[in-house]
Amino acid sequence: MAFTATQMSLVVSSFGLVSFILGIVAENKKAQSGTPVHKKGSVICIYPSDPSIALGYLSFIFLLATTAAGYYSIFYPYKGKFLSQSIFFRSKTFIAFFNIALLTGGLGAAFTLWPTIEEQNFHKHKAYPITTEKCPTPKIGLLGGGALLSLDSTLLWLVALMLAINVREDFIEYGDEGENHLARAEISTSI
């Protein structure tokens, strides 16, 4: 089955939007604190039931799907015309957006996964020393920050896809002269 760039951009943006929404909902549903119960020589923390752990993992999975779909969409042979990856990496603008999309995707994954795993550990290991006065919870705002980075990554993948389409059209239209045309186009846009 042949895909078009529009279909691929819809897949990328759908996965990214779902990741963003799940991350925001996970941040909002996260327990603010646990209730400490003093027992013999320790404190047992009782945390309310919340869906933030499952939502955090789902947000992470959809972010990975967005990144994979974004990467795949850039190098996909549209209209049956395959181009070498080296052709795309001749464009400095494309390189910048491609690398920033990868970086924000990685940061979004870290910001989503870290508090999710931390919260899961807090729910699993509930006993703390008697000196504990407050039950620990993950830092507030990390899941929301991960959700925003996920949305940023999605938008950057879409920009990288648009730049890849421009590189593809220039190379197909101008052939081997496409590299010279690409260099002239970058010089004219930077001036």
Regions found by a protein language model. Give the residues of each.
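Juxtamembrane membrane-interface segments at transmembrane-helix boundaries in membrane proteins
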Residues: M1-A2, V37-G56, S84-A96, A127-G145
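Intrinsically disordered cytoplasmic terminal tails of membrane proteins
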Residues: M1-F3, P77-F89, L163-I191
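N-terminal helical submodule of small eukaryotic multi-pass membrane proteins
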Residues: M1-K81
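Alpha-helical transmembrane segments of multi-pass membrane proteins
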Residues: M8-A26, L55-T67, S91-E118, I140-W157
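Transmembrane helix-loop junctions in multipass membrane proteins, especially transporters and channels
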Residues: N28-T35, F75-K79, I117-K124, I165-I172
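Structural signal for membrane-spanning alpha-helices in multi-pass inner-membrane proteins
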Residues: G70, A160-A164
